[in-house]
Amino acid sequence: MEERERIIHLWFKMWLTKQDLGIDDIFEEDVTYVESWGPKYHNRKMVKHWFHEWNTRGKVLVWNIKQFFHKGDQTVVEWYF
């Protein structure tokens, strides 16, 4: 669980700093990433493209984690902007 939380914190930090600090290390090549409001990205290349493109025009000012939920091999994060 600690490793999962470390990875999630790293992912949030990437958005806050607008830096790819290891997308290749935290996502498998065949990842499916679903945003909280619906859009899906079907592979690591698309996730990286979305990350880099979004960060050319936007900035995440605050992204706080309220709590983690762990069940088996799944982890869910409650967060707020």
Model-derived regions, located:
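Small-side-chain structural scaffolding
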Residues: 14, 31, 75-76
